[in-house]
From Swiss-Prot:
Keywords: Aminoacyl-tRNA synthetase, ATP-binding, Cytoplasm, Ligase, Magnesium, Metal-binding, Nucleotide-binding, Protein biosynthesis
Quaternary context: Tetramer of two alpha and two beta subunits.
Species: Haemophilus influenzae (strain 86-028NP)
Alphabetized InterPro entries for the sequence: aa-tRNA-synth_II, aa-tRNA-synth_II/BPL/LPL, Phe-tRNA-synth_IIc_asu, Phe-tRNA_ligase_II_N, Phe_tRNA_ligase_alpha1_bac, Phenylalanyl-tRNA_Synthase, tRNA-bd_arm
The protein's name: Phenylalanine--tRNA ligase alpha subunit
Length: 329
């Protein structure tokens, strides 16, 4: 019996001496004591040398000692496995109190914001949006708008030509012509879209956006036009601006004017052009200028956006710099 107690203590001591709570080393001890050639297995095999009368009692004592050692080993195994699992979980633990990754949301481009702002204002006054092709014919871009053959806008250095009859439109005015050809007065339309001119510097790009307005009715007049633009500019810039109309010249309107607003620096800033639709333009689409009159407005979207948000370089709108674009979210 003393021999069995010493064997149990020896097994426990071997288990306790394992470094770093190694489960591999623990399994080696299990094999050493309880395997096919282990100490306790050998003791059970030696029972055949014991008399039949003593064998049951001796077998019970060996099993009792074996069970004590095995329970100690299994307890250590459970303890160390739990410790290993806890260490792994601690290493992989996520601190939910830390802020998570910010979900970035997209935003409208400032040019789109301006288009939406302008079209919303005029749609509430009964103007509808009309669209037209960006590859336009010489007729709709120039001839129908009373722009003669010798006009400088037709020059190669100002216009992108595909051939003598097709070009990238330089204005959305062609939409006005197409609309007047298919609709009868009264007409109230907006024509937003991309236009193209051969120019590139701090205030010009080869492609930019324009919105044009057209109103044709029997009593359309310049007084209505001035009142409409006064209201629009004050609503767009959200302040009671000083607005002035300067006489100007456009082939498709007569009389014509350019519209300025007073900037915060005390200087006048040009914002758009306008005028009464030229009688020749009305005749070109089959509308009698003696019965109907109309006015037209043309505004550069980027120009309005630059003034509203104090942007100094128009090219910034097309560089996709998130540091710039995030300011408008």
């Amino acid at each position: 019996m003393q021999h069995l107690n010493e064997l149990v203590e020896k097994a426990k001591l071997a288990i306790e001496s394992i470094q770093d709570k190694s489960l591999t080393a623990l399994d080696e001890i299990r094999v050493e004591y309880f395997g096919k050639k282990g100490y306790f297995t050998q003791l059970m095999q030696e029972l055949r040398n014991v008399s039949a009368e003593e064998r049951p009692a001796m077998g019970a004592k060996i099993n009792e000692a074996k069970q004590a050692a095995l329970e100690f080993l299994n307890a250590k195994k459970t303890e160390w496995e739990q410790a290993e699992l806890n260490a792994k979980l601690e290493k992989e633990r996520v601190d939910v109190s830390l802020p998570g990754r910010k979900v970035e949301t997209g935003g409208l481009h400032p040019v789109t914001m301006t288009i939406n702002r302008v079209t919303k204002f005029f749609s509430e006054l009964g103007f509808s949006v009309e669209n037209g092709p960006e590859i336009e014919s010489d007729y709709y871009n120039f001839d129908a708008l009373n722009i003669p053959k010798h006009h400088p806008a037709r020059a190669d250095h100002d216009t992108f030509w595909f051939n003598p009859e097709l070009l990238l439109r330089t204005q959305t005015s062609g939409v006005q012509i197409r609309t007047m050809e298919k609709m009868q007065p009264p007409i109230r339309i907006m024509a937003p879209g991309r236009v193209y001119r051969n120019d590139y510097d701090q205030t010009h790009t080869p492609m930019f956006h324009q919105i044009e307005l057209l109103y044709v009715d029997k009593k359309a007049n310049f007084t209505e036009l001035k009142g409409l633009l006064h209201d629009f500019l004050r609503a767009f810039f959200e302040e009671d601006l000083q607005v002035r109309f300067r006489p100007s010249y456009f082939p498709f309107t007569e009389p014509s004017a350019e519209v300025d607003v007073m900037g915060k620096n005390g200087k006048w800033l040009e914002v758009l052009g306008c005028g009464m639709v030229h009688p020749n333009v009305l005749r070109n689409v089959g509308i009698d200028p003696n019965e109907y009159s109309g006015f037209a407005v043309g505004m550069g979207v980027e120009r309005l956006t630059m003034l509203r948000y104090n942007v100094t370089d128009l090219r910034s709108f097309f560089e996709n710099d998130l540091r710039f674009l995030k300011q408008f979210k």
